């Protein structure tokens, strides 16, 4: 599920636990910024409960500024996630852009189990999930004129509540000790 909301960020792109700025373009002074902060989660499961989803709900703030004379046509924002080596793109937003300077926010929601990023066993064992936001600004011909990435890592843990066996079982009986002589 994807929701798109364009907002004026002002100085908000500089806020967040992780901020990356990379200006990569043919013109030397093109700039792009992303802000991303991801919180971890911990949950206790009942004895009979199973993990059905791990949902990444994320808002990515972005901004870019290209030099005069450079005309962008498309802004692409991607969200990728992974545990361990490698990241998998779990959501993408693409929108037209005709302005040399723009900023906004993209909201994404993705199930990391459904997309194959995580397994329920990984979550039960506890896993650090890396989330990466990517921004690309392209021209009509597909040339990338500005891009940036921002990354954050958050723990995900689901523990099964322990069962107190003394609550569910009992033992008893009667007996005697006797001495026998041969």
Model-derived regions: residue spans:
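Terminal disorder- and signal-encoded targeting elements
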Residues: 1-182
């Amino acid at each position: 599920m994807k929701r798109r909301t364009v907002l004026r960020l002002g100085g908000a792109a500089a806020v967040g636990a992780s901020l990356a700025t990379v200006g990569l373009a043919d013109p030397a002074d093109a700039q792009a910024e992303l802000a991303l902060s991801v919180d971890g989660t911990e949950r206790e499961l009942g004895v009979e409960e199973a993990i059905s989803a791990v949902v990444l709900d994320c808002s990515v703030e972005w901004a870019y500024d290209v030099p005069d004379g450079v005309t962008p046509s498309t802004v692409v924002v991607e969200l990728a996630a992974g545990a361990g080596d490698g990241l998998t793109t779990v959501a993408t937003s693409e929108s037209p852009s005709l302005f040399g300077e723009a900023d906004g926010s993209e909201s994404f929601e993705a199930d990391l189990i459904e997309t194959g990023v995580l397994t329920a066993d990984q979550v039960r064992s506890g896993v650090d999930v890396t989330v990466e936001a990517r921004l690309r600004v392209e021209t009509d011909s597909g040339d990338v004129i500005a891009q940036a990435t921002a990354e954050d890592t958050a723990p995900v843990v689901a523990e099964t509540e322990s069962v107190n066996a003394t609550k569910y079982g009992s033992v008893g009986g009667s007996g005697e000790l006797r001495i026998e002589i041969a």
